[in-house]
C-alpha cells in the first residue's frame, strides 16, 4: 500500500508507478484507483504507487536517475495554469519537454492538469473556457483512433464522466497529438483525451477517479497494460533494477509525504475492568432527558447532546464531568506552544500562565507544563498521552471517557495560525481538549443511561440524584422548562459583514476559479454580537437549543483556571447546534457525513420542492466536489472507502440540506504494516472539506491570505478561529465522534462578546444574490436569539 515497505520478491510481481501530485484534493482517489488494478498480465497482478509532489524534485536531473525504477508515470490533476510553467506545476512542465528525448519510451498518463501540460508541450493552446465546468457530469464520445490505440479498449462509444476544469485544450493543427475523445456543451466540441504520437503518452481532461465517472478503473487498467506491453517491447521491463539498493530508494521516496501514525496502534489492548465503572439504568427515550439531567448537575460540565434523533445521528448524548484529575491540553498556534495542566489547579493563575507562555517566568507553577511545539507536533503530544490509556472495553458505548473539546479551523493543514481575537493581550487557543474520567452517557433510542468512571470516582450523590429523578420514569415533562428567549432587559450591538465587502470577496472567488486555481471556495463571514450585560453562556445555550434543535448540539465553557480576585481569564465558550457530523470512528471504521446545499424552510417550501432545488447542477456539483475531496482524505490512509449514501435530502429545524455518507473500512487491517486509528484520519482530514473547497491547499491559502482577511476585518482579521473547526471526543475505547463547528457561536472572553460564523460554497454556477441569501439563512438560525 501507500506507505508499506517493499519486499524485493514482491516487486518482481508488481508494476511500479510514479504518481506526481500537484497538491490536489483528488490525488488519492487516483492513486487507489491505480492500486486496485490487478489483472495486468500473467505474473503481474499488483501495482505499487509511489507518490511525490510536483516540487519534490527541483529538476529533471534529480528524477532521471530514478526512472528505471518505474514502469509508468501518472501526472495527476491540480490547480493552476500550465502556461505558468514551474510556478504552478513544478517539475511537470520539464517532464513533458522530454528531457532531450530521455522519456520517449516511458509510459505517461496525464489527468486534467497533466493532460493540459502534455498537450501544451506539443504546441497546443490551453485557454480559459467561456463556461467553466466544475463537478458536472457529461457524456464523452470516442473516435476510431481511441478504439485503435488501446486506452479505451472495452469501452462503449459513449460514457459519462465528471469534469473539473476551468481551462481547455485546443489541439487543432497540432500534428503530434492524436485526438481520442471529445464532449460537447455550450463551449462547443471540446477535446477530452489525446495521445502524443509515436510516444506512450496519453491524457484525459476529465476525472476518471470521480465517484460519478463511469469506467474509470478500466481506463487505468488499460493504461497499465499498455505500459507493460511497451516496456517489454522496449526492454525497459528487463532493465528495471530491483536490487536492495533500489528497494531502499523506493521506500525513501514513499516516505517523502508524511503518513506516519500519530501513535503506534496495538493489535490487543487491556480490558481495564479493574478500574472502569459502568452502571446502566433504564430511562425515558425522550431527547429532552439530557437537558433535564443538566438541570440537576451542579458540577462543571461539557454537553454533547441531540435534540433531533434520526438513524445513525443524534442517538446518543454525552455529559462530560471534568474534575481535579482531568488534564487540560491547550495549543496556541501563533506561539507554537502547548500547555498541559490539571483542571482548576489552585497553584495556577491566568497571570502566571501568561508569564510562562511569554517566557517571562521559567518557574512553572503546580502541574503546568509548557511544551514548545507546532500544531503538527501537538497531535503527537495527544497520541503519547492517549496510547497507554486505550482499553478494549464497552465498545458498544460511544464514549466511556477520554479527550473532549474543540479543534479550531487553524489547527488544520495548510493554514497559518494567527491571533483570533480583538484583544492583543489575551491568549487565544487554537485547540483545547480535556481528559474526562467521569461521564453520563444516554442512548435515546433504547432508553438507557450510563454512569461511567475510568477511575471509580463517579460522584455518589449525583448518581443517586439520577436514580431518584429519572430511572424507570418513561415520561418526562412534555415541554422543557428552559426559556425560549433571552432576558428582555439585555440589548445587543450586532456587527454584520458588509454587503459590499462580501460582493468583492465573491468576485475574487470567481476570478480564482476562472483562472483554474480552485474548483470551489467556501467563503465564510463573521458576525459580532456585544450584549449590554454579560449573560451566562449556559443561559444562552438553553435558549439556543430550544430555538434551533439539531443532532449535534454542544456546550463547552472552559473554566479550567480559577480566576484570582484581580483577574478576568479569557474563558473560551462554545455553543453549537450543528447539523453536520464531520467524522465518526470506531476501532476499524470511520464515517464522514458532508453537508452541502441549503434551502430555507418556509410556508411555501416543502421536502419535494427542496429536493428539486437541491438536485440542480449547482447544488449537485457543490456536493460532488466535497464528496470526491472527502474520499481523497480517507484514501490517503485507508484502502477501502465506500460512498454509502449519495446526496440525500434531509430536513432540519430551519433548513433542508443535501447530505452524503462516506465510510472507510480497515483502519487496523492485519494485512497492512501500518495500523492507523481514527485520530490519524482526523488529523489528515482537517480542516473539514465542506468548509474549505477544493483543491484544499491552495483554496484555504487564498481564502485566508487574499479574501477573508479583508471581508472579516471587523472581527478577527481574517482568522476563523473556533468556527469551521470541529468539536467532539476521542474515547479510550477507540471510538470518536466530531461535528463541524457551524450554526454555532463562540466567545474568547467569557461572554463579553460573541462571534457567529456563516458561509457557503462558491462555485462558478453561484450567484451573488443566491450566496448572500444562503449565508444569511445559515446565520439567522443562531443569530435569531439576539434579535
UniProtKB/Swiss-Prot annotation:
Other facts noted in the record for this chain: Present with 1550 molecules/cell in log phase SD medium.
Active site residues of this protein: 112, 207, 209
Domain of life: Eukaryota
Annotated protein name in UniProt: Aminodeoxychorismate synthase
GO molecular function terms attached to this record: 4-amino-4-deoxychorismate synthase activity
Pfam families: Anth_synt_I_N, Chorismate_bind, GATase
Record field: catalytic activity: chorismate + L-glutamine = 4-amino-4-deoxychorismate + L-glutamate
Organism listed in the record: Saccharomyces cerevisiae (strain ATCC 204508 / S288c) (Baker's yeast)
Region (PABB component) residue spans: 304-787
GO cellular component: cytoplasm
PROSITE patterns reported in the protein's UniProt record: GATASE_TYPE_1
Top class in the EC scheme: transferase
Biological function: Catalyzes the biosynthesis of 4-amino-4-deoxychorismate (ADC) from chorismate and glutamine. Required for the synthesis of 4-aminobenzoate (PABA), an important component in tetrahydrofolate biosynthesis.
Main location: cytoplasm
EC number: 2.6.1.85
Cross-referenced SUPFAM superfamilies: ADC synthase, Class I glutamine amidotransferase-like
